[in-house]
């Protein structure tokens, strides 16, 4: 296999973890003129959520935000015609290498083939993210690890009973995200990190234990019924 370079861009925290995006070497200079962040898009029909990378032109401000994969497609392949969309072939929605992008008609669905855990662990995204050190911001400023909460429209809301909070597996390379609210197992010690299964939780423990702090739940008084 010929050696090649990739860019790994930090997007910030969303869905309970720090997210990164992969880009081709030729697109690395974009970091000079764009800022990047992760955003969650919640399916209005209740079919879970997806996380995408957004790019913001530094000269135009926050109003210039757009999906990174669409920006890259237009730079290298041309405009997206009405009735078409750009999708990620491997279903990893932050793997924005050009080889992983494809233009398809709206309504297109990939083959219903379940990606085995073995295939997932051998994917380029998995291998790349697995090599990253622990996020220094998580290690030095754990108080800043605030999870964003989203409603059904994908808008950030305060923590409240009717908010829809989807989590992605806390193990950095894993991109499995909850299809239903509170679906994943939660770390019994900190009550924050969530995992798609015991295997990912075990793999994440060497890094997670450095800033996993036992959470003391406040005692809640039950309200007496009105008479």
From Swiss-Prot:
Signal peptide: none annotated. Gene3D superfamilies: 6.10.140.2220. Zn(2+) binds at residues 187, 190, 208, 212. A zinc finger (MYND-type) spans 174-212. It is found in: Cytoplasm; Cell membrane. One of its GO terms (molecular function) is zinc ion binding. Expressed in brain, testis, placenta, heart, liver, skeletal muscle, kidney and stomach. One of its GO terms (cellular component) is cytoplasm. It is a peripheral membrane protein. Coiled coil: none annotated. Pfam families: HNH_3, zf-MYND. Keywords: Cell membrane, Cytoplasm, Membrane, Metal-binding, Zinc, Zinc-finger. May be involved as a regulatory molecule in GPR24/MCH-R1 signaling. Interacts with GPR24/MCH-R1. This is Zinc finger MYND domain-containing protein 19. The gene is ZMYND19.
